[in-house]
């Protein structure tokens, strides 16, 4: 399956860095340079996704990606800038990655502190 060029949207992948403070709380930052990628981004829908994510479904995006910059087991919880600029905090987080022979299905969850 090939993704149509006209359906692809430019987004930016930001790899996360996790450190801990004195009280062992996680501090997530995105210090690395953003990586430009093109993917098909759509609103998440469907019965299966509704059963998995429930009321969070309205904050989810379903994406299709072809390439090697996002990989299953490596990029979960990294940030994606969909509606914000590449120099801002990511507005979405990678929730899951499913690898198929010709593409990857990626579920994004909107960060709580963002709108859209």
Residue ranges of predicted features:
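Short, conserved turn/kink motifs that form compact alpha/beta structural patches or helix kinks used as
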Residues: 27-116
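Active-site-proximal polar cores
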Residues: 1-28
């Amino acid at each position: 399956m090939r993704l149509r060029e006209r359906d692809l949207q430019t987004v930016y992948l930001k790899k996360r860095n996790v450190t801990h403070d004195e009280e062992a709380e996680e501090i997530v930052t995105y210090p690395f340079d953003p990586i430009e990628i093109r993917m098909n981004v759509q609103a998440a829908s469907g019965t299966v996704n509704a059963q998995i994510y429930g009321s969070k479904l309205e904050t989810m995006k379903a994406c299709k990606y072809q390439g090697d910059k996002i990989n299953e087991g490596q990029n979960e919880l990294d940030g994606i800038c969909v509606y914000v600029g590449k120099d801002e905090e990511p507005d979405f987080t990678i929730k899951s990655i499913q690898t198929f022979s010709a593409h990857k299905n990626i579920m994004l969850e909107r960060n709580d502190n963002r709108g859209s």
